[in-house]
Amino acid sequence: MKYSASTSTPKSAQPKEEELENSLPTNADYSKIDVSKLSEMMQRYVEVKQQYSHALLLFRVGDFFECFFQDAVTIAQELELVQTTKHAGKEIGRVPMTGVPHHAVEKYATFLVEKGYAVVVCDQVEDSAIAKKENRQVKREITRILTPGTLTDDGMLKARYNNYLAAVVIAKNYWGLAYTDISTGEFLTTQTEGLDQLTQELMRLQPSEVLFPTKAPDIGFMLRPGERSDHLPEYLPHSFCYSLRPQQPFSLGEAKERLLMKFQLASLEGLGCERLPLGVRAAGGLLEYLEETQKENQVPLQRLRSYTLADFLILDHQSRRNLEITQTVRDGSYQGSLLSVVDKTSTAMGGRALRRWLQQPLLSLKGIRARHDTIDELIQNNDLRQDIQRVLRQIYDLERLTGRTGAGTANARDLVFLADSLTKLPELSTFVSQGNSPYLKVLQKIPPILQELGKKIHSNLVESPSQKLKEGGLIRPGINERLDEMRKLAEEDQKWIASLETTERERTGIPNLKVGYNKAFGYYISISKSKANLAPDDYTRKQTLTNEERYITEELKEREVRILTAQDDLNELEYDIFVDLRNEVGEYAEEIRNVSRAVAALDILCGLADVAIYQNYVRPTMVDSRELKIIEGRHPVVEKYLPAGFFVPNTAILGSKNLEKNNSGITPYSAPDLIILTGPNASGKSCYLRQVGLIQLMAQIGSFVPASSAVLGVSDRIFTRVGAVDDLATGQSTFMVEMNETANILNHATEKSLVLLDEIGRGTATFDGISIAWSVAEYLATEILSRTIFATHYHELNELSSILDNVANYQVTVKELPDKIVFLHQVQPGGADKSYGIEAGRLAGLPDSVIARARQVMQQIENHSKIAIGLRKGINKKEEEEIITVEQLDIFSEEFGDSLL
C-alpha cells in the first residue's frame, strides 16, 4: 500500500511550528530521530508508521496496544487517557507513549474512527514465547485498517444506520458517484450533470467517508469533518471525512479492469453502467481502496447497480431538514422525527431499509401501489401480520452477518446467529404462502439451500461457542473423526492430571498437597512451607512463594508437554474446520442477501400496517395527474405527541385539473395550483405546510397516510422553505440563505413538484419583502405551475387570487375574545387581514408595558401608512406590463415621529 511518507498535514489542521515545539514532549516527532538508534521494536514501529503516516497506529506490545511519538499525544488527547513515556533506545531516551488494553482495542479504535481518524492495527502474529526462546522480537504485522467508511464489526456500527463509503469523480460540470456499505454489500453508482446535485446526493447518503482522487502531495491523508485542502473542491460539503487518493486507480482503464475482474465479467454491459464512464471510474477507485484497506479480508460486495436521480422523488437537504424526516430541526434528535413515528420494524435490516425508503420515495405508480397492496392485505389479515412479526423478531441482522461471513471475519457466534435466522425462513415462507400481494409472494419460494446451510451450521457448531476462534470450544463431537480421537487422548491426559492430586497425597502423606496450573509456569505440585520437608526426592523445585513451594516431576513434565501440544493441535484443527464451514456459507452470500432484502421490505410493511391501524391512517388513492386532495389531513408527528383528539385536522386541495394554457392566460380551476395561506403568528401555518409535505412523502414510500381520505398525484420533487437560519460557515445572512434556497426552488421545480413556502421575503425591508414575495408567488403560479402553498404575513398577496384563476386564499382562523384571541388551528377559505403578532408576543410573556406600547405604535402606523398594489386582471406579457404602485408615508418623517410622542 503506497502512502505518502510526508508528515505534513492539510493546512487547516496544521499548527504553527512554535506551538508544536511548546506543546509536544521531547522526541514526539519520529521524523526528526535517527531511526538506526532506536530499539529494534521501535524501529519496527517507525517502519510501519512511515507506510501509514496518515493514520493512527496501534502497535501490540504484550497485553497492550501502544502508540508512540505524535500518535501517543493525539490519542491521549482524543480519548482522555494518561500519556506516559517509554524508553526507545540508549541514545534516544524516552518518547511519548499511550496504551490501551488489548481486549478493549475495538472500543478505543471505534472512538477514534468516530472522530474521523484512520486507525492501523499492527498485531503480534506469533506466540511471544517462541520469539523469546529464539531471543528475537516477536513478529508483528498489520491485521486491520479501520477508516470511517470501512467498518464491519457490530461493535463499531449503529444497527439501524447504513455506513456508506463513497467515491467521487468530477469532470467539469459532470460527476460520477459510487458508494457501498461493506457491512451489507450494497454497491451502487450513478452519473449526471450539475454539481449542486452532487452536493445534494452526498447530503442524502451522509457517507462516513468520501474518496476523492487528486494529484495533491498529501495523498493518503484523511480530512476530518471541517478540515479542508487546496486540492478538495470548495463546493463539496464540509461535514464529511475525505480521503485524498491517487488518481491512477480512478482512471477509466484501470477502474474498468478492476470491476470486470471483481465480478468475473467480460464487459460492463452486464452491470448496466457501460455508458457511465465517471460512475465506472468512481466505482473502480472505491474497489481499489477496499483492496488496500481490507487486506486478506475480501469484501463480498453485491454486483454493482446503476441508478439515476430521476428514479426517485428528489428531496434536497434543506427540504429533508425542514420536514424533519429522520431528525428534528431543533436538536437533531431521532425522537420527534417522522422516522420515530413510522419505524415499527422488528429487524435491524428493516430499520436501515426504512431509512432509505424515506430518503428515496418512489416515482413509479406500480411500485407505490404494490406497497399499498401489501399493507392492505396485512391490515385485513391481522393473524398473518402478527405471525410474520413473531418470526421477524427471531431473525438477526442477516445482511451484516453475511457480510462478515463472506469477508472471513465472522466468529462462531456470528455463524450460530446466522443459522438461527436461516432456519426461521421456512416458517416465514409458510405464513406468506397464501398471500396475494407482491411483497408476500416474493418470500413464498426461499432457496432450500439456505435452510440446509442453517442446519449444517447448527450440527457442526456447539450451541454457545466462544467468540475467540483459536482457543477451541467450537465444534460438536462426531463432526470430525480425527478431532474426536485427539479429544479422547486429551481427556485421558486430563483425567490423569485430575487423579494426580489424590495419588500424590496418598504417596507423600501430605493432606494439603495440590496440583495446579498457570500460563507462566505450566503444571505444578504445591506444598505448604511447613510440609516442604516431606517432599519426595523425585520432586524438583520449580518456584518458591511466600507460603508454599511448587514442584514438578519428570512424569508431570512429560504429561504437560503432551497436553499442551495436544491442546494446541486440537484448537488448530477446530479452527480449520470452522474456517472451512465459514467459507462454505460465504459462497452463498448473494442468495442470503437477496432473501434478506425481501425480509427487510416485508418487515417495513408490517410495521407501516401497525402504524396505519393504531394511528387511523388511510390508503391514499395514487393517480397519474397533478391532483392533491387531502381531506382532514393530520401531521403524523404532532398528533402522536398530543392527547387523543386534540389535533385539529385540515384539508388541502391543489391542482385537481391538469393545466391548460391559451392566449388569454389560464383556464379556470376546480382547485388552485397555488394557495396563499395567511393567519396569525403561532397559529399552525408551518405545521400545515409540513403536514401536506409529509403526507405526500409518506404516500410515495408506500405508506398509508394520516387523513380521512387522500387522492394524490405523484410528485417529482418536494421543496420546502420553512424557518430561517443563517449560515455563518459561508458568511451568509439569514436573508441570503433564504434567497439562495428560493432561487434553487424556482430553478428546479416543475409542474409535478410540490412547493411549500413559509414567509418568503421577511428578512429584508417590508416593501422589498412584499415585492419579492409577490413576484415569487406569481412566477410559481404562471411559469412553473407547480402545486404550491405559500404561507405569508404579507396580506397584500391575497390580491393575487383576484387576478389569477389558479390562485386561492386560505387562512388559519382565530376567535377574538374581548381580552385575548384563541387559535382555532382551522384552515378555511379566505384571506386574513391581521397577524396578531402583538397577541403572540403577549402569550410569549413580553412585559405588559411593551405590549401596550406596541399597540400604540401599531395604531399610529395603521393611521398613517397605506400600501396599494394593483395588477391588471389577466396576464399577457407580450402586450401588457404589470403595474405596481406603492404609496407609503415615510414613517421616519418628523411628522410621524411627533405623532408617537
Swiss-Prot record:
Biased composition (Polar residues): 1-12
GO molecular function, one term: ATP-dependent DNA damage sensor activity
Keywords: ATP-binding, DNA damage, DNA repair, DNA-binding, Nucleotide-binding
One GO cellular component, as annotated: cytosol
SUPFAM superfamilies named in the record: DNA repair protein MutS, domain I, DNA repair protein MutS, domain II, DNA repair protein MutS, domain III, P-loop containing nucleoside triphosphate hydrolases
Residue ranges of the region described as Disordered: 1-25
Biological process per Gene Ontology, one example term: mismatch repair
Matches recorded under CDD domains: ABC_MutS1
Binding site for ATP: G679, P680, N681, A682, S683, G684, K685, S686
Highest taxon of source: Bacteria
Purpose: This protein is involved in the repair of mismatches in DNA. It is possible that it carries out the mismatch recognition step. This protein has a weak ATPase activity.
NCBIfam families: mutS1 (TIGR01070), PRK05399.1 (NF003810)
UniProt record similarity statement: Belongs to the DNA mismatch repair MutS family.
Name under which the protein is recorded: DNA mismatch repair protein MutS
Organism of this sequence: Trichodesmium erythraeum (strain IMS101)
Gene that encodes the chain: mutS
